[in-house]
């Protein structure tokens, strides 16, 4: 799972790089890509719902174009206002106003009313600080790439264990070791490696 600001070419390059690292490895197959777009909580809820959906769909279109992905491989959704992200930031950094804002988030179910109550704290100073320092970080797209490991034969395993043993689990290593015969030098070397 990674987060990204799609307006930043460096972040988009990171997304491509993570997908490329899976696509270029013959041992993996991409099964699904999940995209979630978020907007920060300021402003009108309906407008934020549109923005978060647009963020998510923009990345979907970008990936579909770059990788010729089928619709069935992509799950796309959006979160209109990233209140969970704001609460997580508050808990992590513990500013003096943390509890006031957390109470508003927890006790005010209507998003636009939450926003108005936060604006009212300390004459808007806290809201303006959040707007400047925190809210930009809450406008993002998260993506998760799910993949499967392609099964390989014992012969392929013998090659993989020499060059990329980190790609093998203990059972696969054991199968390769047994293929050399219990007690053989190769068997012992592999068994010692996996311990």
Where are these regions (language model features)?
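A short, compositionally biased domain-edge/stem linker segment
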Residues: 18-21, 128, 157-160
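Short, charged low-complexity linker/loop segments at the C-terminal edge of domains
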Residues: 147-160
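Extended repeat-based scaffolds of very large eukaryotic assembly and lipid-transport proteins
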Residues: 143-144, 166
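Alpha-helical tetratricopeptide repeat
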Residues: 137-138, 155-156, 166-178, 188, ...
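Periplasmic peptidoglycan-binding/anchoring modules of Gram-negative envelope and division proteins
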Residues: 4-36, 64, 172-176, 181-189
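Short, small-residue-biased leader/transition segments that mark boundaries at the very start
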Residues: 2-3, 195
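Residue-level recognition of well-ordered beta-strand positions that form the cores
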Residues: 36, 144-146
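Periplasmic OmpA-like peptidoglycan-binding domain that tethers envelope proteins to the cell wall
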Residues: 40-143
């Amino acid at each position: 799972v990674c987060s990204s600001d799609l307006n930043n070419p460096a972040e988009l390059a990171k997304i491509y790089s993570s997908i490329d690292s899976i696509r270029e490895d013959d041992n993996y197959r991409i099964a699904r890509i999940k995209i979630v777009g978020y907007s920060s909580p300021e402003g009108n809820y309906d407008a934020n719902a549109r923005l978060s959906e647009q963020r998510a769909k923009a990345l979907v279109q970008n990936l579909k174009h770059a990788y010729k992905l089928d619709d069935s491989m992509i799950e796309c959704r959006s979160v209109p206002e990233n209140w969970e992200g704001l609460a997580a930031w508050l808990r992590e950094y513990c500013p003096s106003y943390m509890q006031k804002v957390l109470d508003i988030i927890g006790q005010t179910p209507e998003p636009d009313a939450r926003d108005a109550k936060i604006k009212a704290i300390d004459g808007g100073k806290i809201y303006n600080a959040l707007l400047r320092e925190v809210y930009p970080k809450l406008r993002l797209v998260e993506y998760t790439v799910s993949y499967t490991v392609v099964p390989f034969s014992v012969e392929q395993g013998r090659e993989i264990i020499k060059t990329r043993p980190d790609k093998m689990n203990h059972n696969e290593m054991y199968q390769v070791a047994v293929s050399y015969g219990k007690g053989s030098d190769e068997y012992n070397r592999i068994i010692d490696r996996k311990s």
